[in-house]
């Protein structure tokens, strides 16, 4: 006689009685947005579609998503309890200070505001000795006046007497598969580093250097993002290389704007080469060639706008590399009238480097695990979607990823 397998091997039934009015747990959803309105590091909970529309704006993508989310399933016994939303800085994020709402302030009252205003952005104090909004014809016009005043005298951080900038180029470079080779006979100017986009010859659009091989900036091998075969050609790397020399003072750092000589506008230091604050090489954001000259580094200008959704002034760091970006609440006699202090309802969001699912998602869970499913507001790349799925597969079925 063939023996049977006990049913308990497959299922273990635990008898229990549900309360007569039990409705079960609410399965909240988590939405990752690449918009910048949610402060970095915060997970906001919204109880309704209308609350999402109020915070993000009625025409926002977040509001459209929430309208579908809270509609739920027709005739379902239970609808979603809340929608959690957090900012995923896909390409990094600059720091910002958003004031409390002044939407109800009459224009005449706005025009009466004057005084001092100080904001520490990216580690440097921006001071406006005499903000005067008497000529402002709108809230946006007032924002423009504040921006001009805060950027009128930018702190000079570093100086040099003999610095130069060259483009990043190399001759006779080849690519085989995912390996870029800059041979020993190549003429190299500037430096090549991970993160640079390279062009030249038949190189495919969007090809970036992803890592060092034997090369450390010049001759040698590097890995690239797109597999391809390219015969010997001259390549150019994005950005340029700044060499700080001569008599050097102060501390040169990522996020500062380089000025002097024939330097192009908005040239920012985006990486360190051999320079670690003084003489040496640095990577800058704009491709250009500048002959030896007296160059300086100064605090990067801020942007000031009027946010019509929140009805508040928004001060944003101009630093291109989010991780080097920071901001604090404002001070001075005009700060409170402009609602730019913590006491008047202002909020801050600090800068952030580009996020990865492997490090971002654990930080969210550490803050709250009151959600069951998660998705992105944008269409992720295949590699990005796989990275989210890979993280989710290690969570012991706690969450579901909706790609």
What spans do the regions from the language model cover?
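Extracellular Cys-Trp
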Residues: 80-89, 303-307, 317-403
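Glutamate identity and glutamate-enriched acidic tracts
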Residues: 21, 62, 87-90, 111, ...
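Extended, beta-strand-rich, solvent-exposed assembly scaffolds of outer structural proteins
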Residues: 48-57, 109-330, 387-393
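General N-terminal targeting signals
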Residues: 63, 69, 288, 330-332
């Amino acid at each position: 006689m063939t023996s049977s397998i006990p049913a308990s091997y497959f299922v273990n039934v635990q008898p229990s009685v549900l309360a007569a009015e039990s409705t079960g747990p609410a399965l909240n959803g988590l939405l990752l947005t690449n918009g910048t309105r949610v402060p970095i590091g915060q997970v906001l909970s919204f109880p309704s579609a209308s609350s999402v529309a109020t915070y993000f704006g009625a025409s926002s993508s977040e509001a459209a998503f929430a309208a579908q989310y809270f509609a739920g399933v027709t005739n379902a016994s239970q609808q979603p309890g809340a929608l959690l939303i957090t900012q995923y800085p896909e390409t990094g994020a600059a720091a910002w200070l958003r004031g409390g709402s002044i939407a109800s302030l009459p224009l005449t009252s706005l025009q009466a505001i004057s005084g001092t205003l100080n904001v520490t952005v990216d580690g440097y104090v921006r001071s406006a000795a005499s903000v005067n909004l008497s000529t402002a014809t709108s809230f946006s016009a007032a924002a423009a006046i504040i921006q001009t005043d805060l950027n009128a005298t930018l702190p000079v951080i570093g100086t040099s007497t003999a610095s130069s900038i060259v483009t990043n180029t190399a001759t006779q470079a080849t690519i085989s598969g995912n390996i870029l080779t800059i041979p020993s006979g190549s003429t190299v100017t500037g430096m090549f580093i991970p993160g640079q986009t390279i062009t030249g010859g038949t190189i495919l659009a969007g090809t970036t250097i992803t890592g060092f091989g034997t090369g450390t900036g010049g001759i040698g091998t590097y890995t690239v993002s797109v597999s391809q075969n390219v015969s010997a050609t001259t390549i150019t790397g994005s950005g340029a290389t700044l060499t700080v020399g001569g008599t050097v003072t102060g501390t040169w750092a990522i996020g500062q704007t380089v000025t002097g000589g024939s330097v192009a506008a908005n040239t920012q230091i985006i990486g360190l080469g051999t320079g670690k604050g003084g003489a040496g090489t640095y990577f800058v954001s704009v491709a250009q060639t500048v002959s030896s000259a007296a160059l300086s580094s100064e605090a990067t200008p801020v942007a000031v706008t009027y946010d019509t959704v929140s009805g508040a002034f928004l001060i944003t760091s101009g630093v291109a590399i989010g991780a080097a970006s920071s901001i604090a609440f404002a001070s001075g006699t005009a700060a409170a009238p402009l609602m730019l202090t913590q006491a008047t309802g202002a909020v801050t969001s600090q800068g952030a480097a580009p996020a990865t699912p492997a490090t971002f998602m654990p930080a969210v869970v550490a803050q709250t695990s009151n959600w069951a499913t998660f998705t992105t507001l944008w269409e992720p790349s295949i590699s990005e979607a796989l990275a989210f799925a890979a993280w989710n597969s290690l969570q012991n079925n706690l969450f579901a990823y909706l790609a």
